Structures are given as C-alpha cells and as structure tokens.
Curated annotation (Swiss-Prot):
The family this protein is said to belong to: Belongs to the bacterial ribosomal protein bL35 family.
GO BP annotations listed: translation
Keywords: Ribonucleoprotein, Ribosomal protein
PROSITE patterns: RIBOSOMAL_L35 (PS00936)
Protein source organism: Rhodospirillum rubrum (strain ATCC 11170 / ATH 1.1.1 / DSM 467 / LMG 4362 / NCIMB 8255 / S1)
Residue ranges crossing the lipid bilayer per the database entry: none
Protein name listed in UniProt: Large ribosomal subunit protein bL35
Highest taxon, organism lineage: Bacteria
PANTHER family reported for this sequence: 54S RIBOSOMAL PROTEIN BL35M, LARGE RIBOSOMAL SUBUNIT PROTEIN BL35M
Listed GO CC annotations: cytosolic large ribosomal subunit
SS bond partners: none
InterPro entries given in the database record: Ribosomal_bL35, Ribosomal_bL35-like, Ribosomal_bL35_CS, Ribosomal_bL35_sf
GO terms assigned for molecular function: structural constituent of ribosome
NCBIfam families, alphabetized: rpmI_bact (TIGR00001)
Length: 65
C-alpha cells in the first residue's frame, strides 16, 4: 500500500495544535486594506480554531496530521 499524500494547500493554510485541533489564520487581511475599518483589521489579526464539522473535512486531507 503506497503512502497517502497530504494536500499541499492544506499543509500551507492549516496547523495542528497540541490537542489535535486545527488552527487557521483569519481572512480579509491580505490586500485592499484602506477600504476596511480599523475594527475589522484588528479582529483579523490572529488565528482561530475551526469548528468540528470543518475539522473533520480538513483532517481527511491530512492523513498523518
């Protein structure tokens, strides 16, 4: 049986926490920032944990994660 491959897009965009949850960078922070409010830019600074339904989908693409 050959090794399963991890999707490159998933590898770049998501990271696993120590407890096995999936962490993601918040969207809307890459370009066209002059049109966006200060509050929106501040809230888009960090990362967040995916919900359980989305975690199940993403984990299918990360067989060894």
């Amino acid at each position: 049986m050959p090794k399963l491959k991890t999707k490159s897009a998933v590898k770049k965009r998501f990271s696993l926490t120590g407890t096995g949850k999936i962490k993601v960078k918040v969207a809307y922070k890459s370009h066209l920032l002059s049109n966006k409010g200060t509050k929106m830019k501040r809230q888009a600074r960090g990362t967040f944990i995916l919900c359980d339904a989305d975690q199940r989908i993403v984990k299918k693409f990360m067989p060894y994660g």
